[in-house]
């Protein structure tokens, strides 16, 4: 079964420095139908204005992934990390026993567009960690493993049984992903247009897959997608 979550159906929020769309219930937006999907809890589609950002704030027991689509994001945290994340780069932070961080747009004029993702960990009280992985030079027509429980194939090790893939497609590109029994998929279209198992999707759309044996993607334009393969 495939259930489509259209971009325009998400929860919108707007502030002086931030325009965002919530795929799942978050902050003041609540929808009992969309409290998360398996261990996936948050997908926020954020556009932060020049000079804007999230001031220092704490987290505990959450796996936090940021994927930058355009612009740049300056990260600082209580573990001593200070980095500027650019398009095509994945940032990972395990909050574990507790971490504080800030995320700001260092440009005074150019917005930064990103996806902020939260995944529930499989255990509480893990050691806070930080990692990055770049797919800026990755060729289209393939899924790239960004994070996994085992850290296999050079992916970032995370505290949950989920494989997180970054996919890039051009017009006419086809990507296939085989699902093992009792696995689930959430697919989030970050940019562009594509077909998922014959169903049309556009930027901002999401899809929940259960009971499927494979994911078949066909690019209609230059596109990016995040695929979560969950237990």
Predicted regions and their residues:
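Jelly-roll (double-stranded beta-helix
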Residues: 1-231
């Amino acid at each position: 079964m495939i259930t489509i979550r259209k971009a325009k159906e998400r929860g919108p929020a707007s502030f002086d420095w931030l325009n965002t769309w919530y795929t799942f219930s978050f902050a003041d937006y609540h929808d009992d139908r969309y409290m998360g999907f398996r261990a996936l809890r948050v997908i926020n589609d954020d556009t932060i204005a020049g000079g804007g950002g999230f001031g220092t704030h704490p987290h505990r027991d959450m796996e936090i992934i940021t994927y930058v689509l355009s612009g740049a994001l300056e990260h600082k945290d209580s573990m001593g990390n200070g980095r500027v994340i650019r398009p095509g780069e994945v940032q990972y932070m395990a909050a574990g026993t507790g971490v504080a961080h800030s995320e700001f747009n260092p440009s005074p004029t150019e917005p930064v567009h990103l996806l902020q993702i939260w995944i529930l960990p499989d255990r509480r009280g893990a050691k806070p960690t930080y990692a990055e992985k770049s797919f800026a030079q990755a060729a289209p027509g393939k899924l790239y493993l960004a994070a996994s429980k085992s850290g296999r194939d050079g992916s970032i090790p995370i505290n949950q049984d989920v494989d997180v893939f970054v996919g890039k497609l051009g017009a006419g590109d086809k990507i296939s992903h085989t699902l093992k029994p009792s696995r689930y998929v959430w697919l989030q279209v970050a940019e562009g247009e594509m077909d998922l198992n014959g169903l049309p999707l556009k930027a901002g759309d999401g899809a929940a897959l259960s009971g499927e044996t494979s994911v078949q993607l066909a690019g209609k334009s230059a596109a990016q997608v995040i695929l979560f393969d969950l237990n």
